[in-house]
Amino acid sequence: QRQMCIRDRSEYEGWYCTPCESFWTETQLVDGKCPDCGREVKKAKEEAYFFKMSKYQNKLMEYIESHPEFIQPESRKNEMVNNFLKPGLQDLCVSRTSFTWGIPVEFDPGHIVYVWIDALSNYITALGYTPEEKGELYNKYWPADVHIIGKDILRFHTIYWPIMLMALGEPLPKQVFGHPWMLVGDEKMSKSRGNVIYAEDLVKHFGVDAVRYYSLHEMPFAQDGTITYEVFISRFNSDLANTLGNLVNRTVAMINKYFDGEIQSGDVHGDFDDDLKAVATGAIDKIIKKMNTLHVADSMDEIWKVVDRANKYIDETTPWVLAKNEDDKPRLGTVLYNLVETIRIIAALLSSYMPETSKKIAEQIGADDLSFESTKTFGETKAGTKVGEAVPLFQRIDAEKKLAELEEEFGQPEEEKIEIAPYKD
């Protein structure tokens, strides 16, 4: 504890936000309130130990400038630099004497360790770290490749935490990503406003994969996302039931109808085939690139580009027209082969995002290999494979009926915006 305590104890006087457990200076307040949560702050005065943050200000600034990927997204980095580093860091109060609950300061038991010092140090102490002995787990897992944390606690993770590590002589995490919120309009979720919806309630009404899809797809990289029942249902019907669900259902149904459920060989080449194959097999590299930069929503868009291209391929090749002429049956077989192979690739790509849906698709088309590596090759599906029954992946929702049902159950107006909370208390 003393290793990081650069300045001896003194008297702290400033503004304290109890919900955020944060101290603020007069100039940092916004309209006299906490700049993070907007709640009232109270004047605090007590004896405390201080961490001389300014000693490391230039070092941290140099690190951020030489490691542009350290704080992401870029807008968050600018916020930390312009709002905290450039104005000059204040000494950080790292102990409290106004209460007794918490971890006592070892060399001065009358002081309790400030909660954020305790919380942040857990990243390494949980791995067995001590200044005297690092430990096997610490050497294996630290530094972390990425901290993914809420944007409201970015200051603690990109200023306090790096400086703590610098003071200890330990490496910094390679990247800190401040993820956005799922908002109610332009505000955070609030129980007092009655606008909270729990993830398990969404799952009960829409299924877990639909919730996964919405949460991952509707959360932009750098901006807050929003959710309403209306938009959720619209996405469910358009993206899942129609775009994806109809593609799988139509393809399996046509194979059952025209070839008694048996996948034909794909050796009668025609127009549009090459473009479909290129889009399907090229998706994985684009997805990996997006995921490596934490653009999760954009990575899902790459999957839906394959889905959209497959639906367009159906319109271009008109298999129902080919089925009318016996001479066109070989070409029809190839068209359906190309579709089912594209669907196999889609199922593989979805396996990390929507695992239940991926499994259902694989069962319907008789696919075994859903590895990411297999998506780079077009032609893994074996001719002669039997498809299953064409069962809808997602049943369309009657929006008016479902909204009324939700209003009755949760007592919320149909047009009220809501947020996802992970678990009930």
What are these regions, as identified by a protein language model?
Residues 2-6:
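Short, small-residue-biased leader/transition segments that mark boundaries at the very start
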Residues 7, 24, 41:
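Cys/His-rich microdomains that often coordinate metals
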Residues 11-15, 25-37, 289, 293-294, ...:
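Basic, alpha-helical terminal appendages of large translation-related enzymes
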Residues 13-20, 180-182, 231-232, 264-271, ...:
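A glycine-rich phosphate-binding loop feature that marks nucleotide/adenosyl-phosphate handling sites
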Residues 19, 36-37, 43-257, 299-303:
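Structured secondary-structure scaffolds
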Residues 31, 66-68, 108, 131-141, ...:
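Short, glycine- and charge-enriched coil/turn segments that flank and shape catalytic ligand pockets
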Residues 220-223, 227-231, 236, 251-273, ...:
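Long, amphipathic alpha-helical stalk/connector segments used for oligomerization, subunit docking
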Residues 241, 245, 277, 281, ...:
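Generic structural concept
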